[in-house]
């Protein structure tokens, strides 16, 4: 009986995450999440489940669906929460992408240590995702589809997002709902063909299934094979990153520039996916980066403005700034070179003696300005130090100085006033 595939999938989940784990269930009230929540309640205590309904406010029935979800959770004895999110500024990404982004932001913010996020994506969803990504020319990351388990990096913690029904076919989910006489809500927007996924679901995939009855399963197999290939590429990227220098905002190519472009591209992809928040690479960015790497002019300082932030390239180093802070004024104990995204993560405490510790009260850290150095020899020496230290030009213009009572007493990494 096909409905048992759902129960087997939930049994696999419980084996993977034994008690006392908590489950955060993305619960829309639709067929898929209703089946997942019901099956989960048959295997674990309802007290270990927290169901969350994300209200985008895009449909007139949104509040009614929230009420239906609340009543369903009350019947099951499950904690319920309805979260309102605002979907706006859709000119660039489209309403589907923005709604999905807002939904996951809300869900991820509620995942804590010891809690697993569950979403009800199934085999048909995987087939749709694979074909949608193929249609937009995605690389191997997109063609590998949705993973069964995805690690989430949030607030220096690694949390997990699991899709327990990912290998379950849609017929089995319908069969489960029929077997246990479940009720669910129907979103009328799922029939609107203006949405790309709906067009694929209602117009394209039925024709493919008619010719190839097991196409959903085969698409899922292809995604799985590509996921294995992606894992190998990630391992290669980790090896390459060991030979270079990087943080969450820059990647140096100095020691790896002799590698072929495809390998550098793979390393850059992995770096952004693993360490950089808010940056999504595309063909245009890759082309720009390749041109930067091939540029033989050491004085070149290419820059690329993005919808969010900007990319810069200097001295074989790629930088990503989401908000480059040019103006700042910080108390001494608030200063953090990494937070300011300075290439040299230096610290004033490294150049100040213990005797100077008592003199720090009332000091502030601010950017360097042209009048901080009075003599030409000092300016020349600082310029030489910047060059030898390979400090990018934009960092030179905002380089930190320590000031007390209107006087510069130290320049980060370069100078400390003798009388201080």
UniProtKB/Swiss-Prot annotation:
Ligates lysine onto the cytidine present at position 34 of the AUA codon-specific tRNA(Ile) that contains the anticodon CAU, in an ATP-dependent manner. Cytidine is converted to lysidine, thus changing the amino acid specificity of the tRNA from methionine to isoleucine. The gene is tilS. GO terms for biological process: tRNA modification. The N-terminal region contains the highly conserved SGGXDS motif, predicted to be a P-loop motif involved in ATP binding. GO terms for molecular function: ATP binding; tRNA(Ile)-lysidine synthase activity. Pfam families: ATP_bind_3, TilS_C. It comes from the Bacteria. ATP binds at residues 28-33. NCBIfam families: lysidine_TilS_C, lysidine_TilS_N. PANTHER family: TRNA(ILE)-LYSIDINE SYNTHASE-RELATED. Its main location: cytoplasm. CDD domains: TilS_N. One of its GO terms (cellular component) is cytoplasm. It comes from Hydrogenovibrio crunogenus (strain DSM 25203 / XCL-2). Its EC number is 6.3.4.19. Keywords: ATP-binding, Cytoplasm, Ligase, Nucleotide-binding, tRNA processing. This is tRNA(Ile)-lysidine synthase. It catalyses: cytidine(34) in tRNA(Ile2) + L-lysine + ATP = lysidine(34) in tRNA(Ile2) + AMP + diphosphate + H(+).
